[in-house]
C-alpha cells in the first residue's frame, strides 16, 4: 500500500515537472529559436547516421552547414528586438548577447568546410566530428545568453566536454592523447575553481543566482564590499581565465594547439575566446559592479602578462601551431583592453569589431596550415621556405593573414587594433595601451620572419617538403579554398569599412 502511494506520488511529480517543462518550451521556445535549429540539425545527423548503412557524406556536411546558416538567419531576423528574459530568468535575449552568438555561429560555419579535406585524408569519423562541433556551438550560444550562475556553469561545461573529445579525436596520435589529458585535467580544475567562486557570490547575495538579482541581494545584505566578494572575484577570474587562456592561465594552450587536429585547433582558437569574452563581460559588469576597480586591476595584470609573454615566447617557436598558440595569448591581451574599457568609451564595440577581424585572420591562417600540412606532413616553420615558388596563392593568402594579425596597414587587423587602442587611451589606460603598441611591433617581427621564408626563391633554401609539394586531387579542396578566400577578403578589409561595422557594434551595448 505504501509502495502504491509512493508510486502515485512519483508519477504525479514527474507529470508536473514534464508539464512545467512543456509550458516553458511552448511559451519561451521562440526566444531560443536559433538554438532549436541547431538541436534539430543534431537530431537529423543522428537519424542519418543510425539509419543509413552507407553514410551519405555530402548530406552530413549539408545538414550541418545549413543548420548553422539558418541559425544565423534567425538571429539576423531577430535583430533590434526588445531585450527579453525567458525560462524563469535563466536566459536573456538582447543585441549584445546575439552578436556574440553570431560570431560563434560564424566560426563554426567557416570551420566545417575547412575540415572537409582533413577528415577525408585522415579518415576520421565524420558524423561524430560534426556532432561535437554543433554541440559545442550550442553550448557557446547558451553561454552567451546565460543569465544565472547555473546556466553560466553548465553551458561552458557542454562546450568544454565537446572540446576535450575533439582535441583527442585522432586516438592513435600520442601527442593528441597527451594534449587531451592536459586539457581535461586543467579544464576540470578550472571548473572547480569557477564553481567555488560562484558559491561565494551565491552566499554573499543571500542565495540569489540571477545576475541582476545578485546585485540587488548584495545591496540588501550590505555585502558588496565584503571580503567574500573579493574571494569570489579572484576565484571567478581564475576560472574564466582558463577559457580565455591569458597568461598565466595559458599553460594548456600550446600543447593542445600542437597535439590536436588542425581543424579542431582552428575551431577552438576562436569559439572558446568569443564565448568566454561574452561571459566575462556580463559577469564582471553586473555582479561585480561595486568592485570595478578591483577587477579592472586584475584584468590589467592579465592583459600585460599576456601581451608580453605571448608575443615574446612566440618568437622562439619552431612549430607553426605553437607559434599561433602564443600569438593567441597575446591577442587575448588586446581583447581584455576592450573588456576593461567597457561601454563608456566604446570598449565593447571595439572589442567586438576586433574579434570579428580576429576570426577572419585566424581561420584564414589555419586554413593555409591545414592545406600545407596535408600535402607535406610537416608543421615546422622552416619547412615553409620557398612555398611561393610552388603555390603562390597559398603563400600570398597566408602572408596577408599573418600581416593582418600583426596589425600592418591597410589590413583589417591594423584598423581593429587602432580603434581598440584608441578607446583604451581615451579611457586613461595609457600604460596598458603602450604595452599593446610595443608588443604589436614584436609580433610583426615573427610574422615577417615567416613571410620571408615563404617568399624565399633560392633553391638551396627550399626544403624537401616544398620541393616535393603536390596539389591535392580531392574535390573537397574547393571547400577549404572557399573558407580561405572568405577569411582573406575579411582580413584585408580597408579602413573605409570600419565606420559601419563600429556603428553596428555600438548598437549591441546594454
Swiss-Prot record:
Protein's UniProt keywords contain NAD? yes
Top EC class per UniProt? translocase
Alphabetically sorted, this entry's keywords are:
Chloroplast, Membrane, NAD, NADP, Plastid, Plastoquinone, Quinone, Thylakoid, Translocase, Transmembrane, Transmembrane helix, Transport
EC no.? Answer: 7.1.1.-
Reactions accelerated catalytically: a plastoquinone + NADH + (n+1) H(+)(in) = a plastoquinol + NAD(+) + n H(+)(out); a plastoquinone + NADPH + (n+1) H(+)(in) = a plastoquinol + NADP(+) + n H(+)(out)
GO terms, molecular function: NADH dehydrogenase (ubiquinone) activity; quinone binding
Q: Which residues cross the membrane?
A: 24-44, 57-77, 99-119, 124-144, 149-169, 183-203, 227-247, 295-315, 323-343, 347-367, 395-415, 418-438, 482-502
| Location of the protein in the cell | Plastid, Chloroplast thylakoid membrane
Its family remark reads:
Belongs to the complex I subunit 2 family.
Subunit comment for this entry? NDH is composed of at least 16 different subunits, 5 of which are encoded in the nucleus.
Spell out the protein name for this chain: NAD(P)H-quinone oxidoreductase subunit 2 A, chloroplastic
Which species is listed as the source?
A: Cucumis sativus
